[in-house]
Amino acid sequence: VGDYGDLKLLLTDAAEKSHADFMLINPIHATAPVEPLEPSPYLPESRRFMNVTYIRPQDIEEYAGLDEAALAEVERLHAEVAPANDNADELDINSAWWHKRQALQLVFKVPRSAERQAAFEAFKEAAGPDLRAFAAWSVAFQMWGAPWEGTWFAETNRDSPEVAELMRDHADMVEFECWLQWIADEQVTAAQTAARESGMALGLMQDMAVGVHSLGADVWWNPERFAVGSVTVGCPPDFYNQQGQDWGQPPFNPNYLAKTGYGVYREMVHNMFSHAGAVRIDHVLGLFRLWWIPQGEGARGGAYVTYDYEAMIAILTIEASRVNGLVVGEDLGTVPDYVRTVLAEHGLLGCTVEWFARVDDSPNAGDPYADPADYREYALASVTTHDLPPTAGYLQFEHVKLREELNLLTGPVEEFQASATAERQAMLDRLVESELITPEIAADVDDHIQEIVEAMHKMLLRSPSVLLQAALVDGVGETRSQNQPGTSSEYSNWRVPLAGPDLKVVHTDASVRPAAREVAFRHHERRKSKRPHITP
């Protein structure tokens, strides 16, 4: 399991060896304080605070102050979980976090210098009452059990005497949860600082999830902010997810947002830009409208509810301009044309993915792919997304095999196999036409997978898009899906270790393929002349 120290090293390595200008990461919003952890970074407990499971204990200043017994215990805890880092099977995130949390509690007990304590106090003051609210939920989770296993979530709230008593009786635990947030903030800030000092134009690109867990800290402490209990958020059916998706998240209450001047949204965006040079908005359509799904209806039974996109885009552009940053809106799938027009008018980038980019936006699998030279300029262009298998896997129909295995297909497997075959052939035709592969390679895909993956990345370089992205999974030749939309426990979503085609875990950059590095380098060369202008 990686940590913020690994992130820092990845950023500086990408900057120094590939001249990369940014690195897009999954959301690092807050998760549960103890196991069981929610594997999906897109279903956080709070979007205001950070995921502390990625803290690197050794990088905390007070780590050096551990006494001999405490240091020995920390090293023992680390030794117990270290072998898992060489295993390409499913990551045991619960065990990894349990061991790390014990180590962090020991570091927390080390006395801080006056300067460090002052910095901690300043952090708490700047974070405001929401920090103690999140800490209270975290302590309640530990003392009263997971909220889905008991009644405390429904029977208590921020004004309950039981909650006040809990915070008094367990003030040390509340302080520990606040401290974890401070340490996470420090380490992500250090990663972003290192990225910029290494020459990255943007550094970290953080990802903003659509919403939060229905039983998480944000909903418990401030239920009035959400449409709680009767609806969840998702998306309607499309070609890639025939059943639609229900993300299980309560939507923001648009009336509350308007009445309170979008304060909660402002705080969230401001916090993300304090550690990043760019922010990607997952499902940017959510700024305009969200697919509300009535309880028990399934994704097909939903309907769109509109939001004041002008207010939220204004907040995004103002906060981005404070750090000379960028905003990327994930506008894939079912998105009205006016959404892309509005984004471009304000200098917000959209997303273009080679696997989705067809001539005239045709939905038919066998229709020709667009020439990347015709892609939008104001966009982040990539070969694939985290909702598809890595490109090597996609070329070998891993998406069809996995969906059949998980009973996610809505018709005969032969029908979907034929569609995937037509889709692949259309991509091969585009690559042959672009003179990036030969007809002989196109006729013998299985023996030339990596050559085709390289060709697809080289084709991306012909795009005029201001940001170009290569996925790390493609860089090392991984084939397994990191995430299968529409599933939860059925698949090991977000727990698949990074491995090469031989399923050996990747620890160094030695396996990163030249085309992935070239995408980063070519993007660096063009960035100064193509920087979009953010318009608040």
Enumerate the predicted regions with their spans.
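A structural motif corresponding to the C-terminal end of an alpha-helix
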Residues: 13-19, 187-202, 271-278, 315-326, ...
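Hydrophobic faces of well-ordered beta-strands that scaffold small-molecule active sites
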Residues: 21-25, 202-206, 279, 327-329, ...
